Amino acid sequence: MKILNNYLYKHVLVILCFAFFAQLFYFPSLSGKKLLQSDIVQYSGMSRQIKEYRAENGQKETYWIDNAFGGMPTYQLGAKYPADFLGFIHDLFRLLPRPSYILFLYLFSSYVLFLVLPVDWRTAIFGSFAFGLSTYLLIILQVGHNTKAIALAYMPLAVAGFLLLINKKWLKGFIVSVLGLGLNIRANHYQMSYYLLFILVLLALFYFIDAYKNKSLKVFLKSIGLFSVSGLLSLGLNATPLLATSEYSKFSTRNGSELELNLDGTKKIKSNGLDYDYITEYSYGIFESLSLIIPRIQGGGSRENLGSDSELYEFLVKKGISKSQSRDFTSSVPTYWGSQPILEAPAYIGIVVFLFAFFAAIILKGPLRNALVTASILSLLLSWGKNLPFITDFFIFNIPLYNKFRAVSSVQVILELCIPILAVLGLEKILSEPNKYFKAFFKPAIILLFMLISLLFLKLIGAFSFKSPIDSRLLEAYGDQILQQIIYAREIVFKEDIIRGIILISLACFIFSLFKFKRIKKNIALVLFFGITIYDLGGVAFRYLDWNRFVNKSKIESPFRITNADKTILNDKTRYRVYEPQLSLTGARTAYFHNSIGGYHGAKPRRFQELYQFFNYNELPEILNILNVKYVLYDSEEGLSPLINEEAQGNAWIVDSIIKVNSADDVLKTLKTIDLKKHAIIEDQDAANALTIEKNIDYQSKIQLIEESVNTLKYSFNSNSKQVVVFSEMYYPNGWEAKIDGIIVPHYRVNYVLRALKVPSGEHIISFQFSPKVVEFGTNIRYVSISLFTIILLIFMFGKRLKSNFK
């Protein structure tokens, strides 16, 4: 018992230190400030109606909003669902403020994994920081990719569960697997969960090969079987968001378009996922991949802070530019000369960490090493995207779901987990058997030093141009002299980081030599290795972390400044939409104050985006009219000004005729040629034959909106004959129910994105209610999964005892 208490005390102390470090790392939060994250600012605009609905309805949930893209489900906007067992577990970690609690999760989750490997707890601490302080993981927190960060934080826990089961730790392995997989999926960033699957599949493959060779397939199959059960339960515990997202994805930009033609009339390349160019837009350059270990090999981030001690600053001051202007310019220098459109920071994993991992890859054998090395190489190759088309194309066109995700460069998260695992295994070897591995350790060190020195030599002979694809714009903006200084600055940071790498590798070799020849003890060696790793990773991360982004709480709660134009529009209490052309579909400022046709989302409603692109390309104001855009916010000398659109067609209108067409392309073609006040267009696939118009048109017919909320709309209708009514609301069949006088009736898609309804003569109340059945169905699966998880735990805990009692 005393040994157990000491064991627990040690780990509890480590975990408390992680929490203290995470809070101290983001020290501005200690004074009550909060991190202003750009993506979360946009999310605030998108989620406004969700928060308002919860506040007004006793924290009840709406699964539909009107304030963005004309209306869309909230499934990918932080929707809360019933029976969220895993949410309770996740909330335990949220005792710390954001982003500190996510940094703590990085450290805690990876610490659990490293203890499972197993390695000494002190080496596990080293590994936790090697993983948690990698630049990419910290930068995604700064810009607000919180769901991605949380999903990444739980990745090590899922791998730990797999390894526990492989090592026949059945109960621990089962619990950790369910929690690790479940919490990773619950984070709601399925791209990261998909990449986790890559790691797990490779682990399973190499452990299967090993089990087959060693004739231990029975134990392996038991481990994989239990892990599969864990996986199914983790899916079940996340059934509602998974099913809802799957349902919505068919209508989102993540699914293939129904259009056969591009806007210019050329043939569209068909895909059941995202467009090829969109998927591969952010592809890592092959040479640029060296930034994993040399951060500014291609200039670092798109904007580097070179500081007032830089040669560029001195040049600007000598040219007569004021010191304050020179400081401003050198705080944001376009040193990046890679091919990606924009780069917040290089995905630096640490040259010392890589040295240990490289060493481990050379000297280790076995399925774990093989899986980690293979996963790392595969993720690197895939991150090259369009720069390595034969592999990228194979995955896009042949591997299920791969074409549902963009930014292939982010697949490097796989190696950002695998490399620290290898590094920990390598460090454990040299600390436990220094004499055995002394010579072996110097082989990768010499290779890395040779590579770094070779890069310096290549620079010396002019092998690198240091020219960027954006230099023509920089030349136009700043002139040739300043451009040449920027290019020179790229050369300087290139050289500085290579020399920095040489020094760090030399220090690591020196520390190991001191330890091997017994000049220092093991604990001192570990502390020194830890110190240079923290210096290495922290030094690079701090180049890009901006503490000025921590602001007062009031700024977070009101991230957008209301303008006089917004106030004027808000005086209108009718139902309408607002369009801000400057933002297009890339900003949620308008959605924060109004019902907007714009917004900010990675999975926009596909047909709405296509209609907007069609409107923009053809400059058809009639499209704004049928979307009930009553106000257009345009830039003027006084700021934003509201322009009233007198032609907006309102909430609903009665049409004279229905035009039937064969395809989605035909709908868009026809939209250009007809009067949309009188006619509506329906596709054959949308039950065109069911939506017909009587010859007797009653021009005295009336329809009026009488009640509205985000998920309920009611209209009064009066006509002497049957009519077809078009509503300026987005058509989404899964969840929206149309009723006439309380009786459910079918409604149809017209004009590419809108709803239409056939209404009999007389006075009627028409209503639309959003009640998605997928939420109810998913909730039932969740309850079943919670029950099964509990039953299996009870069997594990009491099964052996019951079995022995009945003998």
Annotate the PLM regions:
Residues H11-R48, S230-A244, L378-L382, S454-L456, ...:
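Transmembrane signal-anchor helices characteristic of membrane glycosylation enzymes that use polyprenol
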Residues A19-S110, F129-L152, K267-I351, L382-T392, ...:
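Membrane-interface coil-to-helix junctions
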Residues Y101-P118, V353-F356, L422, C509:
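Transmembrane-helix motifs of polytopic, lipid-linked glycan transferases
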Residues F114-L133, K168-F174:
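Transmembrane-helix signature of polytopic, membrane-embedded enzymes
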Residues G144-A153, L165-G182, Y190-F227, G231, ...:
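Contiguous transmembrane helix-bundle modules in multi-pass membrane proteins
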Residues K222-Y284:
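Polar, glycine-rich mid-to-C-terminal structural blocks
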Residues S257, L261-K267, G531, Y535-Y699:
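Extracytoplasmic
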Residues K630, K678, I682-K807:
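Active-site-proximal, structured, solvent-exposed surfaces of multi-pass membrane proteins
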